[in-house]
Design a protein with these regions (language model features):
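Alpha-helical transmembrane segments and their immediate juxtamembrane cytosolic regions
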Residues: 1-233
Length: 233
């Protein structure tokens, strides 16, 4: 399981970085060709190959190797201005990869325990708020507690853990004959998030780019009831 999480995280982060660099090509290999080679490399490297023996196994191994070499070429490639492969930010898929890694890592310890996941969700949401405030003074404390090398200041991870929490609530309380209890829980969570959004708005703007707590709370205020609505449908 750990290996699966690791390699899926690597794939998402790599795809995010390649997608980001495809838009910065200036001369030489065109943006279109970079993107085409990039996608081919993705499919060859991370494609799900059937189990095989003999010649087919050799062929699949060669295809995967070709994908890795193709992506390696794109990493070392420099355009006509000498611009190399860059990591300016992680890209959308890269952020998803980091979110997946953190949330999956937490779930390895909490498993299907609703109580443990609820606590983990609360802690991650709290970290998202704290990371945008001055509640932890000092550079040392911030580095140890907030882990700034993890992008999005815990906001995206709060979204991920909200999904985990909702899934476990559905597993525990959802009932087709009596859906009201589960939907009521989600609506209550939505109201709670709306209250937090209104309370936090004077302190932070609504900004997706900055991943502010206010944006997080407004999004969750919509997410929980909407999930209940689609479940009812």
């Amino acid at each position: 399981v750990v290996a699966h999480i690791f390699w899926r995280t690597v794939a998402l982060i790599a795809m995010g970085l390649f997608s980001l660099n495809s838009g910065g090509i200036e001369g030489g290999l065109s943006h279109q060709w970079f993107s085409i080679l990039m996608v081919i490399g993705f499919f060859l490297t991370w494609g799900v190959y059937p189990k095989a023996e003999g010649t087919k196994k050799t062929l699949f191994t060669a295809m995967k190797t070709a994908g890795v070499l193709l992506l390696a070429f794109l990493v070392i490639y420099k355009d006509m201005n000498g611009k190399p492969f860059q990591i300016s930010w992680w890209g959308i898929l890269g952020l998803i990869g980091w979110t997946y890694a953190v949330c999956a890592g937490i779930y390895l310890f909490t498993r299907e325990s609703l109580r443990k996941n609820a606590i983990a969700w609360f802690v991650v949401v709290l970290l998202a708020v704290v990371s945008h405030s001055d509640l932890i003074p000092g550079e040392y404390g911030s580095r140890i507690i907030l882990l700034p090398f993890i992008p999005s200041d815990w906001t995206l991870h709060a979204f991920g853990m909200s999904g985990v929490l909702t899934s476990l609530l559905m597993q525990r309380y959802a009932d087709r004959e009596r859906p009201g209890r589960f939907i009521g829980m989600l609506c209550a969570l939505g109201v709670g998030m709306l209250v937090l959004a209104l309370v936090s708005h004077p302190f932070w703007i609504i900004s997706k780019i900055q991943a502010t707590p206010t944006w997080l709370f407004y999004c969750l205020a919509m997410f929980f009831p909407l999930f209940g609505f689609f479940y009812w449908l």
